[in-house]
Amino acid sequence: MALALVSVAPLVSMRRSLFSSPYELKSIDKTIPNLVMCRKRMSGTPSIRVSSTTSASNDDGVRRRVGDYRYNHWDDDLIDSLATSYEAPSYLERADTLVEAIKDRFNSMGVDDGERMSPLTDLYQRLWMVDSVERLGIDRHFQNEIKSALDYVFSYWKEKGIGRGRQSAVTDLNSTALGLRTLRLHGYPVSSDVLENFKDHNGQFTCSGIQTEGEIRGVLNLFRASLIAFPGEKVMEEAEIFSTMYLKHALQKIAVSSLSQEIEYLLEYGWHTNPPRLEARMYMEVFPQDTIYEQKLVELAKVEFNIFHSLQKRELQSLTRWWKHYGFPQLSFTRHIHVEYYTFGSCIATDPKQSAFRLCFAKMSYFVTVLDDIYDTYGTMEELELFTAAIKRWDPSVVDCLPEYMKGVYMAVYDTVNEMAKEAEKVQGRDTLNYVRQAWELYIDAYMPEAKWISSGYLPTFQEYLDNSKISFGTRITILQPILTLGEPLPHEILQEIDFPAKFNDLISVILRLKGDTRCYKADRARGEEASSVSCYMKDNAGITEEDAVHCINDMVNNLLKELNWELLKPDSNVPISCRKAAFDICRIFHHGYKYRDGYGDATIEVKNLVKRTVLEPVPL
């Protein structure tokens, strides 16, 4: 066969022995003779199995499959023209002044002078302050104050929960639910059993039925707490069912207000599909401003949002230059969604110091999309094998072996991965490139079985499909290098606790693979890609309907999300919480894109709204 001209020994196998040698690459066969000769083989090569409705002939005469995608939704001139005045020193100075004022408020919460903090409300007020700065996206300024406030609340935590204040005689649903959620998210050992105290003698959650604003807010916080459930917590499942029904009923009765808008938002996005920056923007719009401290909280949130918007402009322009430099606009067969991926990154990493994370995440996510379109749709089998070999060789000289449309892609991957490894070395104090290359080999190898399934029309079993596709989905690629730039040293043995095949990474990969399939399988099938978790599940369970298969897979996802909650918050993890949270938020932001439909094949209304509200449009002051 002509392909014998390329001989590359794989760096690693696909077994778990991947990590047996942390930084030492396996041997590579250095002899790849006459690479330029491979270009002679490009014409007349059989392509991947073609769907009659999505095929096209390229200039090279090869009949190829193409996706029915719309292309760049965001005019480059618009991006270049984004203007902002929020980098002016006056805004930075105002932000600093507001931060100090809010710190003073935190530090004065122990003062009982009738004006500030009553022993009948001090617990709830502390929780409310912590929850407010977190939801407004300004909590990075108050980490010490948050810890002090939560230590205080936890010192009064009881088996039946807490009241509004340390001297409250009766436990309170609002305070207990908000406390359960907030303390759990910060690693305090609190049990969901406290919610049993709010059931009636029949074991059912109950409320007065009057639906006052206070009661509604209590049930809203019960709903928010129920989403931070761990596996086996039946009371949390019951709380979610009860609170969801209650809040939907309340929406039918209460007038349109800040409270109703908040309820609608949270019922729609919950927690696992709720991007932090989008929630911050919503919360600014509905946040109460009855007191001077509430006004200062909102003002700081808005000023910080717009200062960050100035930074987003520069980063997005930098990303667009990178995108153009490697010729991605000329690739007509792939999705042009680099702006969307930058938006995703900036929705979950809002600290201005995390620029490397945001740009690395956007670039790695875009690579995954382009390679998915090449391997699943556009490339011929021979071209795919050549590209796979080139990635393993990791040498820019092999670019001459590749067809024209692959050359820029290969050099972009090569240059960018190397560049990001240098960024990571500044944080990690060691060269992580070899480790990252191993991840890329495993990832790129996983594409080949799927390409062969498409070519042959083979439909694998559900488990066979999942074992391979959770790697080919590319989650590891989008997580690994970004978290290495976060500022937290990750020794190899700790990195293994969050990187594939550790359970944390495995869960994220499976969740996104399954959820993505429930949104994409029909469009994929129309392009000739039959294998999906839906079709494979139906194959394994003869007689089941497509609708039932989707329902079963969604149930799997919901159960896996509870496991992911535990992996994020379990007390014995050695991985820094900032890295766990970043990986978890990557899952959340991709899950957001699949909320109602495939947000990646063609940018949906929801994804476009996310770009506008979190990147393109500043908040009115």
Swiss-Prot record:
Lineage: Eukaryota, Viridiplantae, Streptophyta, Embryophyta, Tracheophyta
Listed pathway(s): Terpene metabolism; oleoresin biosynthesis; Secondary metabolite biosynthesis; terpenoid biosynthesis
Organism of provenance: Pinus contorta (Shore pine)
EC number(s) on file: 4.2.3.52
Top-level taxon: Eukaryota
Binding site for Mg(2+) 2: D372, D376
Cofactor remark: Binds 3 Mg(2+) or Mn(2+) ions per subunit.
Gene3D superfamilies xref list: Farnesyl Diphosphate Synthase (1.10.600.10), Terpene synthase, N-terminal domain (1.50.10.130)
Residues spanned by motif DDXXD motif: 372-376
InterPro entries reported for this sequence: Isoprenoid_synthase_dom_sf, Terpene_cyclase-like_1_C, Terpene_cyclase_plant_C1, Terpene_synth_N, Terpene_synth_N_sf, Terpene_synthase-like, Terpene_synthase_metal-bd, Terpenoid_cyclase/PrenylTrfase
Residues holding Mg(2+) 3: D524
GO biological process: diterpenoid biosynthetic process; green leaf volatile biosynthetic process; terpenoid biosynthetic process
Stated family: Belongs to the terpene synthase family. Tpsd subfamily.
Protein name: (-)-beta-phellandrene synthase 1, chloroplastic
Amino-acid positions noted as binding Mg(2+) 1 in the UniProt annotation, renumbered to this chain: D372, D376
CDD domains: Terpene_cyclase_plant_C1
Cofactors, names only: Mg(2+); Mn(2+)
One annotated Gene Ontology cellular component of this protein: chloroplast
Subcellular compartments: Plastid, Chloroplast
GO MF, one annotated term: magnesium ion binding
PANTHER family the record matches: (E,E)-GERANYLLINALOOL SYNTHASE (PTHR31739:SF25), ENT-COPALYL DIPHOSPHATE SYNTHASE, CHLOROPLASTIC (PTHR31739)
Plastid among keywords: yes
Signal sequence extent: none
Function: Monoterpene synthase (TPS) involved in the biosynthesis of monoterpene natural products included in conifer oleoresin secretions and volatile emissions; these compounds contribute to biotic and abiotic stress defense against herbivores and pathogens. Catalyzes the conversion of (2E)-geranyl diphosphate (GPP) to (-)-beta-phellandrene and, to a lower extent, to (-)-alpha-phellandrene.
Transit peptide, residues from-to: 1-49
Location (main, coarse): plastid
